[in-house]
């Protein structure tokens, strides 16, 4: 539930000192799992005050009534299972502070690893570089690539108009020039000028896995960005590989894909079996799981 227009309710802290307010907030987060509670409390306190714990201690901070009201509303939303990123209205990704909403996936650390890998590929290319980010969502990957390689031309493709608005807003806030296109990844037209790099974090979770996932994800993040049919889990990978092979990706260009950890080997095998691809590699994430597939389009 959004916090717009919502007011906090008691009980309230016995005083407005930082120590008392911190203890009050911790106790108020009663439905948040114990190991997460202290971290979420810290994020809320820093977000509302604009200061870290040390800064608040040095300043001997006293919390205002309006700030306590915001903390109470935010704590209630967390207790109701809303993601912390939605409660704060923002998420950090590869050094960028990004707006997030229920219209987009919350950026994950694993996706930062794909951006880093593809940024390394961009660094090894000569001449003008064009990068496409399919299923861009919040624009996190496109904007992170633009931050790392300001001279690259970056294009973000997205089917959801609501998500595109979030991406555009993030680009404006970051002061970055990224071109955003409304398009369907499964029926994509060829670009006028081919790309040097294509990357994507497409939907890849089989629909049958919904019941095994945390409600914090399934109830608050867009299903269209998460799930694929059980009988065709590689549908987006096939579409993007075909789009690239038809000319959207230059020969010698790179394709980078985030995958379900149970499907990365299958995606890699599909590219190897299809032909026209070289250097097909599976990259493991920081948890040691097969998360990304990177491949190079073969030269003629």
Regions flagged by a language model, labelled:
Residues 47, 51, 77-81, 121, ...:
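Phosphate/oxyanion-binding loops and surfaces in catalytic or ligand/nucleic-acid-binding neighborhoods
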Residues 15, 19, 62-68, 105-109, ...:
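Short, solvent-exposed loop/helix junctions and linker helices
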Residues 148, 152-153, 157-299:
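S-adenosylmethionine
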Residues 34-37, 125-128, 249-252:
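Short helix-terminating capping/connector loops at secondary-structure junctions
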Residues 58, 63, 73-169, 182, ...:
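SAM-dependent Rossmann-like transferase core, predominantly class I methyltransferases
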Residues 2-91:
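N-terminal auxiliary segments of SAM/dcSAM-dependent transferases
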């Amino acid at each position: 539930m959004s916090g717009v227009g919502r007011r906090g309710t008691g009980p309230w802290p016995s005083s407005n000192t930082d120590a008392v307010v911190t203890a009050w907030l911790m106790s108020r987060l009663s439905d948040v799992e114990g190991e997460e509670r202290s971290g979420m409390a810290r994020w809320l306190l820093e977000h509302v005050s604009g200061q870290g714990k040390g800064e608040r201690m040095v300043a001997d901070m006293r919390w205002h009534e309006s700030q306590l009201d915001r903390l109470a509303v935010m704590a209630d939303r967390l207790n109701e299972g809303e993601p912390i990123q939605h409660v704060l209205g923002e998420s950090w990704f590869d050094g960028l502070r990004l707006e997030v909403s229920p219209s987009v996936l919350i950026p994950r650390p694993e996706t930062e690893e794909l951006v880093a890998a593809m940024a390394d590929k961009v660094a090894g290319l000569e001449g003008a570089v064009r990068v496409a980010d399919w299923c861009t969502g919040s624009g996190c990957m496109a904007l992170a690539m633009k931050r790392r390689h300001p001279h690259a031309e970056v294009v973000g493709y997205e089917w959801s108009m609501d998500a595109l608005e979030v991406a555009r807003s993030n680009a404006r806030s970051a002061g970055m020039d990224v071109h955003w296109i409304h398009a369907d990844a499964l029926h994509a037209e060829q670009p006028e000028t081919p790309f040097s790099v294509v990357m994507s974090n497409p939907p890849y979770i089989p629909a049958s896995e919904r019941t095994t996932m945390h409600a914090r994800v399934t109830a608050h993040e867009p299903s269209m960005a998460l799930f694929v049919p059980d009988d065709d889990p590689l549908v987006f990978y096939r579409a993007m590989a075909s789009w690239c092979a038809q000319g959207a990706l230059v020969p010698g260009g790179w394709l980078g894909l985030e995958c379900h950890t149970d499907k990365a080997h299958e995606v890699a095998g599909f590219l190897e079996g299809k032909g026209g691809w070289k250097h097909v590699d599976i990259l493991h994430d920081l948890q040691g799981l097969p998360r990304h597939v990177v491949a190079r389009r073969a030269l003629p």
